[in-house]
Amino acid sequence: MHVATQRRNNILNNTLTNALTIDVEDYFQVSAFAPLIARDSWPSRPCRIEANIERILLLLETRQIHATFFTLGWIAERYPAMLRRIAAAGHEIASHGHGHLRVWEQDAGAFRDDVVLSKTILEQLSGQAVAGYRAPSFSIGAANLWAFDVLLEAGYRYSSSIYPIRHDHYGMPEAPRFAWRPRGAGGLLELPISTVRLGRRNIPAGGGGYFRLLPYALSRQLLRRINAHDGQAGIFYFHPWELDPGQPRPPGLPLKTRFRHYLNLGRMQARLERLTADFAWDRMDRIFLKADYA
């Protein structure tokens, strides 16, 4: 069956549109690499972001999908033409912070400077108003909910920064699984990455390394459950480096880090092609910044 026809049929059978999101950072900026890759070495590292973004844009154009690109200010400053190309293709530009500092590594003042700087850079270069923010490594949790006050003051309208799971580097498993306002009515809207509730645990269902680890059929079933059982739009994310099995491999990485980062990179493109054909997708702002959410 022709891909476009298949996708139309799939959409007819799935009334909900899900949010497709990309965290725009390069391979050497991953938080798990921080102990081995000094921040001041970033400018001298071979960047692969442009080629990987082009691959993503081609896939989205083929599928006629618009997505949200949570972009580092650091990347935007160095690749302004790439950022403009993303925006010109009709995608939402959102912030991933400036220098990929985890929120818990900063106090309120430093965090404010980071999110204001990234928002300013992204808006100036893209010509779009930036409404959304995603914390590097989902680094907002119970101990630093003050970050939502800072984001609201800085002019953001929503965040996608809390992952309601248990993980050794991040997570707030007690948090709501769907849209909520951590600071109460009038506070910033938080849109968590998708999970499925099984027993007493939330099972990751929204991308990242779990999407590369789990069989595709299971990932598809989890997302379908969110749409059909929970009646909610799913939120899925991935990184450009996940489509790049040929990326440089820094020496000295711990075994667990190597497993998590490099697992099934060579299969990611094909899985994304299936995922984008099996579900309807759109930008975060178009799905969630509507009267029933905002």
Language-model features: locations:
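The substrate-binding groove and active-site-proximal loops of carbohydrate-active enzymes
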Residues: 39-47, 70-72, 99-111, 136-139, ...
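Active-site beta->alpha N-cap acidic-glycine motif
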Residues: 12-92
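Conserved, mostly hydrophobic/aromatic
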Residues: 23, 60, 96, 118, ...
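Metal-dependent polysaccharide deacetylase catalytic core of the NodB/CE4 family, i.e.
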Residues: 63-144, 156, 161-168, 186, ...
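Active-site-adjacent pocket scaffolds in enzyme catalytic domains
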Residues: 128-131, 135-237
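C-terminal domain-boundary segment and adjacent tail
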Residues: 62, 158, 214-294
